[in-house]
């Protein structure tokens, strides 16, 4: 029941009856506004003024933290060496942090190394290239005169004004006549090839020099006459053999006259044996003997003196 009474009392202030809401006379704009927005604006101003100071403090804090806990450490060695290495690597890490803030909004580090800066936009280069391309564009070529009008001296003009026009029938007749002439010339060439019989046995005085010439073999009579002629030539050389034999006989006679008695006895014995023994065949050489090669005996010298 209490809920219904509250609803009944709030009925005049509902959305449907908001135009009929009665406002008190003492109400003003200053009373309706609250002090909360003024406090929020003051806080924002204080934050902006203190942001620059906080940046410097954060940098100092980062450096101190990095110096205390560097990402890279060297263990071992003397204390002075450890202090130097710690200072060096702490400065490197702080420099990487400071440069990473200038890269952009996405301040992301891949380990201890910073991401490289993005490349500069190539808008300026594209604009320059675009201007050059527009200038280098070829203009559409205009209509040019044909060459036979621009340079008539290079061309020859043919006209058929003096020739009478002929009908189709006459043109066909001329074409048929030309075809017949070609056929007749081909037939005549074929007939000439068929009637040609190559003759191989021709005289040397023939006009066709490139043709093959065959000669008949000679008869047996001619071959016999050649043999007789060869025999005659052999007979004509017999006088040379006679001379050679005469020279050999003289040489034998000279060698038979020896002054020693023992040689004579031997010759006497040999003569008797020759008489008893039948004469044997004597072979003589056909070489010509030079008499100057034989030594002269004292009998020959006496004979020459006499």
UniProtKB/Swiss-Prot annotation:
Where does this protein chiefly localize? nucleus
Q: Which UniProt keywords apply?
A: Cytoplasm, mRNA processing, mRNA splicing, Nucleus, Spliceosome
Family annotation (InterPro entries): TSSC4
Superkingdom of the source?
A: Eukaryota
Q: Where is this chain's protein located in or outside the cell?
A: Nucleus; Cytoplasm
In residue numbers, the region (Disordered) covers 1-81, 109-128, 182-306
* Gene Ontology cellular-component terms listed: cytoplasm; nucleus; spliceosomal complex; U5 snRNP
**Per the UniProt entry, what is one GO biological process?**
spliceosomal snRNP assembly
What ranges does the record list as Polar residues composition bias?
59-81, 198-210
Q: Which residues form the signal peptide?
A: none
Basic and acidic residues composition bias: residue spans: 218-243, 296-306
Which GO MF terms does the UniProt record name? molecular sequestering activity
Q: Which Pfam families match?
A: TSSC4 (PF15264)
Which family does this protein fall into? Belongs to the TSSC4 family.
Q: How does it assemble?
A: Interacts in a RNA-independent manner with distinct U5 snRNP-containing complexes, the mono-U5 snRNP and the post-splicing U5 snRNP-PRPF19 complex.
Known function: Protein associated with the U5 snRNP, during its maturation and its post-splicing recycling and which is required for spliceosomal tri-snRNP complex assembly in the nucleus. Has a molecular sequestering activity and transiently hinders SNRNP200 binding sites for constitutive splicing factors that intervene later during the assembly of the spliceosome and splicing. Together with its molecular sequestering activity, may also function as a molecular adapter and placeholder, coordinating the assembly of the U5 snRNP and its association with the U4/U6 di-snRNP.
Descriptive protein name:
U5 small nuclear ribonucleoprotein TSSC4
Name of the gene: tssc4
């Amino acid at each position: 029941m209490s809920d219904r009474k509250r609803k009944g009392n709030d009925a005049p202030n509902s959305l449907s009856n908001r135009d009929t809401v009665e406002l008190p006379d003492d109400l003003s704009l200053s009373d309706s506004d609250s002090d909360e927005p003024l406090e929020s604006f003051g806080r924002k101003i204080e934050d902006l003024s203190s942001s620059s100071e906080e940046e410097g403090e954060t940098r100092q804090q980062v450096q101190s933290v990095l110096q205390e806990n560097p990402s890279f450490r060297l263990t071992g060695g003397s204390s002075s060496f450890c202090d130097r290495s710690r200072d060096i690597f702490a400065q490197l890490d702080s420099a990487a942090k400071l440069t990473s803030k200038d890269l952009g909004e996405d301040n992301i580090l891949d380990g201890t190394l910073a991401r490289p800066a993005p490349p500069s936009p190539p808008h300026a280069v594209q604009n320059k290239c675009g201007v050059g391309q527009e200038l280098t564009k070829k203009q559409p070529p205009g209509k040019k005169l044909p060459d036979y009008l621009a340079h008539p001296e290079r061309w020859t003009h043919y006209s058929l004004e003096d020739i009478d026009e002929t009908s189709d029938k006459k043109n066909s007749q001329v074409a048929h006549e030309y075809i017949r002439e070609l056929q007749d010339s081909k037939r005549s060439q074929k007939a000439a090839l068929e009637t040609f019989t190559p003759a191989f046995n021709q005289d040397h005085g023939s006009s066709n020099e490139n043709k093959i010439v065959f000669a008949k073999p000679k008869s047996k009579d001619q071959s016999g006459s050649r043999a007789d002629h060869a025999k005659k030539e052999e007979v004509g050389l017999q006088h040379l053999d006679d001379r050679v034999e005469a020279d050999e006989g003289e040489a034998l006679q000279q060698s038979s006259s020896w002054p020693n008695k023992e040689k004579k006895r031997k010759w006497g014995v040999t003569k008797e044996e020759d008489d008893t023994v039948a004469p044997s065949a004597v072979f003589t050489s056909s070489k010509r003997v030079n008499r100057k090669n034989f030594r002269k005996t004292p009998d020959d010298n006496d004979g020459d003196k006499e």
